[in-house]
Amino acid sequence: MTGTRPESKSAAVAVETFLAVIDAPLAAYLESCVHCGECAEACPFYLTTEDPKYTPTHKLRPMVRAYQRHKSPFAPIKRALGLAPDEVTEAELDEWSPLVFDSCTLCGRCTIVCPMGIDIAGAVRKMREGMTAGGFAPADLYMAADRAMTTGSPLGVQVKALKKTIEIQEKKTGIPVPLDVKGADYMVILSAMEEIGFPEVIGALSRLFQQAGVRWTISTQTFEATNVGIQMGSKAVAA
């Protein structure tokens, strides 16, 4: 393994992880789907494109097949009789990677409208665990995870850069930004994208907190809020 990314892709590792994360509640969800299509009507990606491949339950298909072949009721008998689905292949997981990572924000709209009460977004989150373990997550996510593990920020933002950004905002607003204040009422944590791409957020927060008359602070030890491990489905990185 190079950093957080496996040295090579492995459908077997992905399937093994799928099976490991399919607990009793998720198995019940997978068995409960009636393929009504309600989730599609709630998905922004389907509504925008009207392409069936963006149906939320379709995004789960490789994990569902792994479950049906290896872990569903009577799976051994079905395999013996040739009735079980084929093994999930590397090519299929490559094809599904954009659907699982790039075409789902885990917004949960599909979960809300599901008449069977299936937590579809939660299932996609668990499917990402298998995809990531097998090496099928987007390369950018692995690189962001490596930076997060080494620097604490997925974009590699360091304290020096944060302080420089704060200094610029202090000059623009005329309001000092308190750092590492013990006993503050509020502690602000920022995403790396806000720190780099939208630094005016810090200035806006300064104005809000000053108007509210409360004590607040930004910690130079824990200023990064982005948890790329949750985004990519890696418990090790998320921890």
What is the predicted role of each segment?
Residues 2-15:
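DNA-contacting interfaces and partner/effector-binding or oligomerization modules
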Residues 49-62:
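N-terminal cofactor/phosphate-binding cores enriched in small/glycine residues
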Residues 42-45, 49, 116, 120:
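Short, non-ligating residues that shape and space the ligands of small metal-coordination modules
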Residues 37:
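Residues that scaffold, gate, or flank divalent-cation-dependent active/transport sites
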Residues 20-30, 60, 64-239:
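Iron-sulfur-cluster electron-transfer modules
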